Design a protein with these regions (language model features):
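Short beta-strand element of the alpha/beta-hydrolase
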Residues: 112-121
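A short loop-to-beta-strand scaffold at the N-terminal edge of the catalytic core in hydrolase folds
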Residues: 94-105
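Hydrolase active-site cap/lid region
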Residues: 199-229
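An N-terminal hydrophobic leader/cap segment in hydrolases
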Residues: 24-91
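Alpha/beta-hydrolase fold nucleophile elbow
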Residues: 180-191
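The serine-hydrolase catalytic nucleophile loop
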Residues: 122-135, 148
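Alpha/beta-hydrolase active-site loop
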Residues: 159-180
Length: 229
C-alpha cells in the first residue's frame, strides 16, 4: 500500500507565497483598471462630477455681489448661445479619431484674421467655454471651440489630460490656416484645457499662433488624480 509523500514545509511556504502573489496581483489589476476607467475612461464614474458654484451669502457681502454678477454673466452666455448656435465642424486626428468642434464665424470682422481656439476642462465639452467664446466673438474674433478627445461629440475612449490633445490642437490650427492663411491665433484653455494649451505651446507651432493663455491649469497629472481619486 502506497503512502502519500508528505509535503515539505519549504514547499508549503512556496505555494502559500505564490497564492498570495497571485491574489495580490489580481487585486492590483482590478483596482488599477477601475481607477483608470474612473479617472480618464469616457464612461467612467468620474464623469458624474459636479462643481457647486453657489455660495451662501448675506445681501451686503462680497459673495452676494459675485453671485449677482455671475447670474448676469450666465444669462448673457445663455443669450449668446441662443443667438449664436455656431457651426459643427470635424477633423481627423493623427490616430484616426473624428474630433468635433463648434465654429463661431464672425462675418463682420473676418478681414481682421483674428482667431481664438478655446479649450474646455476635465470631463467638459465645448459648451463649458462659452464664457470664453462670447467675449472673443464680441471682440471680433472667429472662434473655434473643440470637444477634446473622449469628450462631447468627439471620438475616443480615454480623456487625454492634455498630452494626447496637444497634437489634436495642432490639427485645429491647421484647420484654421486652411481657411485663413493669414490668421493670427490665440489658444486659450481652462483647467485641463489650460494644460493642453501649455503642452501645445511646447510643440513647433506656426508663426500664426501669437498667444497662449493658460487659465488655472494643473501642476501635474499626479496632483489631479490624487485629488480626484
Amino acid at each position: 500500500m502506497k503512502t502519500k509523500a508528505k509535503m515539505s514545509p519549504k514547499k508549503k511556504i512556496v505555494i502559500a507565497v505564490g497564492a498570495v502573489v497571485v491574489v495580490l496581483t489580481a487585486a492590483l489589476l482590478f483596482v488599477s483598471n477601475y481607477l483608470v476607467n474612473y479617472a480618464i475612461g469616457r464612461s467612467g464614474d468620474g464623469g458624474d462630477r459636479e462643481v457647486a458654484l453657489e455660495v451662501e451669502a448675506s445681501p451686503d457681502s462680497v459673495e452676494a455681489i459675485i453671485e449677482t454678477n455671475r447670474a448676469q454673466y450666465s444669462a448673457d452666455i445663455d443669450a449668446f448661445a441662443a443667438t449664436h448656435p455656431g457651426e459643427n465642424v470635424t477633423l481627423t486626428a493623427a490616430d484616426g479619431l473624428t474630433l468635433h468642434g463648434v465654429r463661431y464665424a464672425n462675418a463682420e470682422t473676418a478681414a481682421t484674421h483674428r482667431w481664438a481656439i478655446v479649450l474646455h476642462g476635465y470631463r467638459g465639452d465645448h459648451t463649458g467655454v462659452l464664457n470664453l467664446a462670447m467675449p472673443y466673438y464680441e471682440a471680433g474674433y472667429q472662434v473655434i471651440a473643440p470637444d477634446l478627445r473622449a469628450c462631447g461629440d468627439s471620438d475616443g475612449d480615454y480623456v487625454g489630460m492634455g498630452w494626447l490633445d496637444r497634437e489634436d490642437i495642432l490639427r485645429w490650427i491647421d484647420f484654421i490656416l486652411a481657411d485663413d492663411p493669414q490668421a493670427e491665433i490665440v489658444v486659450h484653455g481652462i483647467s485641463m484645457g489650460a494644460a493642453t494649451t501649455m503642452m501645445t505651446a511646447g510643440e513647433d507651432t506656426p508663426e500664426n499662433v501669437k498667444v497662449f493663455i493658460e487659465d488655472c491649469g494643473y501642476t501635474s497629472v499626479w496632483d489631479v488624480f490624487s485629488s480626484e481619486l
